[in-house]
């Protein structure tokens, strides 16, 4: 499942009781006394809800008196089991204890003997309003679709809803004749049944797979298609008015599938060679970025559809990354699945990393600095979130429904991907690839875990790497490596990094790579608290190419030498210097005043370097948002840095490459934010030409919206509802951060129900990040918390987006209100989000305590 960059239901050991088993109702995981081998699943799509039947071929390993499986808010009847040709009826038990555990008990009149059986039952349910299970999407034409990850298949049919209980599936869907019906595998036309205005589609049997990957979609859909060189059919499905917008995603998908088939050493053959297919469907309402259902990938529309000439470069990047991410899951997640959700990071971290590997290797359809993007959106983000106090380890023990959804976060995705990249650089690309191939071939159609992966890579590397890697995934946080220049040698020492001043005795085996000027690179393993290395040149950079997930604290000699060569550093190395200097300054390790004085020298017209540097100043601006003096000084410094670039920008011809477009857009947006008159005038002129002559806003749409929202809120709401690109809704919501009129603020927050359920948290977050109504937005959330929880239909991930909007405040009074609100939240699945908000606010208040140091760093020398 792809996380959206604006970014997250679940399990107690319960099981079928044998004669000698103790009651295990207080445990969350199903026992393995009864395991599924095959499902025959039939679902009938009706206007008001759905009904169906399921037959499950099971293997019983010991005598049992009941079978326990997962179900949630389903009406279940006519349960029974066929054993040795005779059907034994079962009594359906769903009491309060079962509801709490999200299970159903099928109790039999006498014990069932160990051996095979065929469990059957019928069920009915309602469509889910929370974008999980089986739900209806709005729009001109309704679409019925499923979303089962992590534990939401149980909303739709009784099942053994755990990733380690794989089985094959035969699916049939009864729906209206006008609908296209899709499932994981191809439909079998010769088996189609038609009656009245309805039809039943039967689908080929799947390979063994987990329940969370089962999917079906029903709607009035059209498609475009292509074929990979290995004969895999790829299609993009969507509304007939939009499906042509899938051409870019289709091309990316085809090329990426071909590359991954080579990289993994195993071709894509789901469900089998000769009938392998991948359908990609844009769903009108969707909570995440996409979902990797095997053979039937579902997407948020803007993560799949790209409109040439109207969509922007961010849309293009998003489509490419999301498609590659989901295709990576076809091997890592689907073909080989984590045994349990504590290794979720292995699915998501790997898919995140390999999506960039894919984009790097699919030719001209991706024409930007892929690894520069990776560093900004994964390494940097992972370090910021993991450095804030009570983070969690990458591999986190989860049991409760609610906990699993919470770990779909930046630690699992961003840090997980960054650690995988670090390991690849440590053992080498070819060795790492061979290890991955070994792991996949050993666990195909089954389950694996992190230890199995390290073992496979270690066998190719010729050395056990598990001890080194385990330290990175089994403990929270990451190290800061201090570098002391002793003349002829360097002393490297490690301690845990913390933005809150809370260190501990954690130790990592750190694969340090040092780049020596004129001498190449040297690999060093820092295993203990410190080590000494011979100095090879006077200028050096520790953590070459930003390959490791750690910060580097240089002494004055080391940093001075590095700064003297700043212009010769690669983009990612230059970003690394900025991130370390300010990351350590923000953690009060010292050097913030120095960094603020030198930031203009670190800056360059490279998009990734410019963004890294400016974002540090804007983050400080956000901390001191109610301090007019600090805000004024930051704005002045930013204006001086970007003014030359702003002057060169032509808003009617924003750039000729993805790099130049990204840079010009970013600088222009910041210029408007900090009040550069020329930037504001250019944006206003583009808006005037748009209104008077129909000039396309194009790449600058959201920047223009932010600048003109107060005078044009009605226009923007119309674009939200009737936009002509899939990404326009997001651009409108980003534009809300520019609201400065109280009546507009009240209009938006007073009518949140007009937004799609998945967008409510995005709207709130956009306004809370803006300057004018930051505190007011937070006041609204803390006074309407329960109402908002119901508004997003108790979807924990969507509600957590709302909770996270509270982290942008610093003042005493508003912080007290936030804390009272957080203390009162009792809903399952928000504990990690609550801690993240508390930690962010604690850091902000800690930073406000060093105001004088910040002031000294911002003031010109003559004024100090």
From Swiss-Prot:
GO molecular function, one term: peptide binding
Cofactor: Zn(2+)
Site (Transition state stabilizer): 413
Its EC number(s): 3.4.11.-
Active site: 326 (proton acceptor)
Domain of life, per lineage: Eukaryota
Note accompanying the cofactor annotation: Binds 1 zinc ion per subunit.
Annotated transmembrane regions: none
Single GO biological process annotation from the record: proteolysis
Swiss-Prot/TrEMBL keywords: Aminopeptidase, Hydrolase, Metal-binding, Metalloprotease, Protease, Zinc
Residues bound to substrate: 149, 289-293
Entry annotated with the keyword Zinc: yes
One GO cellular component, as annotated: extracellular space
Residues engaged in binding Zn(2+): 325, 329, 348
Top EC class of this enzyme: hydrolase
PANTHER family: PROTEASE M1 ZINC METALLOPROTEASE, PUROMYCIN-SENSITIVE AMINOPEPTIDASE-RELATED
Record family assignment: Belongs to the peptidase M1 family.
Protein name in the entry: Probable M1 family aminopeptidase 2
Taxonomic path: Eukaryota, Fungi, Fungi incertae sedis, Microsporidia, Unikaryonidae
């Amino acid at each position: 499942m792809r996380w959206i960059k604006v970014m997250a239901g679940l399990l107690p050991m319960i099981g079928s009781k044998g004669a000698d088993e103790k009651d295990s109702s207080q445990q969350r995981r199903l026992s393995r006394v009864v395991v599924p081998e095959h499902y025959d699943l039939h679902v009938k799509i009706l206007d008001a809800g759905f009904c169906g039947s399921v037959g499950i071929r099971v293997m019983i390993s010991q005598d049992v008196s009941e079978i326990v499986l997962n179900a949630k808010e389903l009406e279940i009847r006519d349960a029974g089991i066929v054993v040795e040709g005779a059907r034994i009826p079962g009594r359906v038990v769903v009491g309060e204890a079962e509801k709490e555990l999200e299970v159903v008990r099928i109790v039999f009149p006498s014990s069932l003997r160990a051996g095979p059986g065929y469990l059957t039952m019928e069920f009915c349910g309602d469509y889910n309003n929370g974008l999980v299970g089986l739900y209806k999407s709005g729009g001109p034409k309704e679409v019925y679709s499923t979303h089962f990850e992590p534990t939401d298949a149980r909303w739709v049919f009784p099942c053994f809803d755990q990733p380690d209980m794989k089985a094959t599936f035969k699916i049939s869907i009864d729906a209206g004749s006008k609908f296209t019906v899709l499932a994981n595998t191809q439909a079998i036309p010769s088996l189609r049944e038609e009656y009245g205005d309805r039809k039943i589609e039967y689908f080929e049997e799947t390979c063994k797979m987990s329940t969370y990957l089962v999917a079906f979609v029903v709607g009035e859909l059209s498609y475009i298609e292509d074929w990979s060189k290995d004969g895999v059919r790829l299609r993009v499905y969507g509304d007939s008015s939009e499906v042509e917008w899938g051409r870019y995603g289709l091309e990316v998908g085809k090329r990426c599938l071909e590359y991954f088939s080579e990289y993994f050493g195993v071709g894509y053959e789901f469900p089998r060679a000769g009938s392998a297919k991948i359908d990609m469907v844009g769903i009108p309402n969707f909570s995440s970025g996409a979902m990797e259902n095997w053979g039937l990938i579902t997407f948020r529309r803007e993560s799949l559809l790209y409109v040439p000439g109207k969509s922007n470069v961010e849309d293009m990047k998003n489509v490419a990354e999301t498609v590659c991410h989901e295709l990576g899951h076809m091997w890592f997640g689907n073909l080989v699945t984590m045994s349990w959700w504590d290794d979720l990071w292995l699915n998501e971290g790997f898919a995140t990393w390999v999506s960039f590997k894919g984009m790097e290797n699919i030719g001209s359809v991706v024409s930007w600095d892929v690894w520069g993007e990776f560093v900004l959106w994964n390494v940097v983000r992972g370090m910021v979130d993991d450095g804030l106090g009570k983070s969690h380890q990458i591999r986190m023990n989860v049991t409760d429904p609610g906990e699993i959804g919470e770990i779909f976060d930046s630690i699992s995705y961003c840090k997980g991907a960054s650690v995988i990249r670090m390991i690849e650089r440590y053992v080498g690309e070819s060795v790492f690839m061979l290890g991955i191939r070994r792991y996949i071939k050993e666990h195909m159609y089954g389950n694996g875990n992190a230890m199995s992966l390290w073992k496979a890579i270690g066998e190719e590397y010729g050395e056990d790497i598990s001890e080194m890697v385990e330290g990175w995934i089994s403990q929270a946080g990451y190290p800061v490596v201090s570098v002391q220049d002793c003349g002829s040698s360097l002393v490297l020492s490690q301690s845990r990094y913390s933005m809150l001043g809370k260190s501990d005795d954690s130790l990592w085996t750190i694969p340090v790579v040092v780049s020596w000027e004129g001498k190449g690179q040297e690999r060093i393993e820092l295993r203990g608290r410190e080590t000494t290395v011979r100095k090879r040149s006077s200028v050096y950079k520790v953590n070459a190419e930003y390959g490791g997930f750690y910060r580097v604290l240089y002494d004055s000699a080391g940093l001075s030498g590095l700064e003297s060569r700043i212009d010769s550093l690669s983009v990612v190395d230059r970003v690394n210097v900025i991130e370390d200097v300010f990351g350590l300054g923000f953690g009060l390790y010292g050097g913030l005043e120095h960094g603020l004085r030198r930031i203009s020298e670190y800056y360059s017209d490279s998009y990734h370097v410019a963004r890294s540097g400016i974002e540090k100043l804007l983050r400080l601006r956000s901390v001191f948002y109610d301090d007019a003096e600090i805000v004024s000084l930051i704005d002045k410094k930013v204006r001086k840095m970007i003014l030359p670039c702003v002057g060169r920008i032509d808003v009617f011809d924003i750039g000729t490459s993805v790099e130049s477009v990204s840079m010009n857009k970013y600088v222009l947006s910041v210029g408007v934010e900090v009040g550069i008159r020329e930037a504001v005038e250019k944006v206003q002129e583009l808006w005037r030409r748009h209104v008077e002559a129909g000039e396309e806003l194009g790449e600058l749409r959201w920047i223009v919206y932010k600048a003109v929202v107060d005078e044009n809120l009605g226009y923007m709401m119309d674009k939200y509802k009737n936009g002509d690109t899939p990404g326009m809704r997001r651009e409108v919501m980003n534009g809300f951060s520019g609201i400065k009129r109280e009546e507009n603020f009240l209009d938006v927050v007073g009518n949140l129900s007009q937004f799609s359920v998945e967008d409510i948290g995005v709207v709130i977050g956009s306004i809370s990040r803006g300057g004018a109504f930051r505190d007011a937005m937070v006041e609204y959330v803390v006074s309407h918390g329960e109402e908002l929880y119901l508004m997003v239909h108790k979807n924990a991930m969507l509600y957590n987006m709302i909770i996270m909007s509270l982290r942008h405040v610093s003042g005493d009074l508003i912080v007290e209100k936030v804390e009272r609100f957080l203390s009162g939240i009792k809903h399952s699945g928000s504990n990690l989000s609550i801690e993240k908000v508390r930690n962010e606010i604690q850091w902000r208040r800690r930073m406000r305590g060093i105001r004088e140091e910040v002031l000294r760093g911002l003031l010109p020398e003559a004024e100090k």
